[in-house]
Structures are given as structure tokens and as C-alpha cells.
Amino acid sequence: DRDSCVDKSRCAKYGHYQECTDCCKKYGHNGGTCMFFKCKCA
């Protein structure tokens, strides 16, 4: 589910997506990016 990390990972304002990426990888995704301060898994 691409939204696995939306509520679990906060997105910083300026491109610090590491937390989002790590969360997404933990759920088996390739990584993640932030859109509108929400983490989206790719």
C-alpha cells in the first residue's frame, strides 16, 4: 500500500525525505517521496 507510511513518517519542509524513504523500504517499497508534507511510497 503506497500510503503505509503517510501517518507513520513526517515529512520535513525542505527535502529531508530520509525518514519517509526508510519507512517505505521497511514496508517493501523501493523508497518514498514527500508530497504536500505526506509520505508517499514508490
Curated annotation (Swiss-Prot):
Compartments where found: Secreted
GO terms assigned for molecular function: potassium channel inhibitor activity; toxin activity
Tissue-specificity statement: Expressed by the venom gland.
Which Pfam family, an example, fits this chain? Toxin_17
Alphabetically list the UniProt keywords. Answer: Disulfide bond, Ion channel impairing toxin, Knottin, Neurotoxin, Potassium channel impairing toxin, Secreted, Toxin, Voltage-gated potassium channel impairing toxin
Q: Which PROSITE patterns match?
A: ERGTX (PS60026)
Q: Does the keyword Secreted apply?
A: yes
User: Does this entry carry the keyword Magnesium?
Assistant: no
Q: List the disulfide bonds.
A: C5-C23, C11-C34, C20-C39, C24-C41
What are the GO cellular component annotations?
extracellular region
Q: Which InterPro entries match?
A: Ergtoxin (IPR012622), Scorpion_toxin-like_sf (IPR036574)
Functionally, this protein is described as follows:
Blocks Kv11/ERG potassium channels.
What family does the entry list? Belongs to the ergtoxin family. Gamma-KTx 1 subfamily.
Its UniProt domain note says: The presence of a 'disulfide through disulfide knot' structurally defines this protein as a knottin.
Protein known as: Potassium channel toxin gamma-KTx 1.3
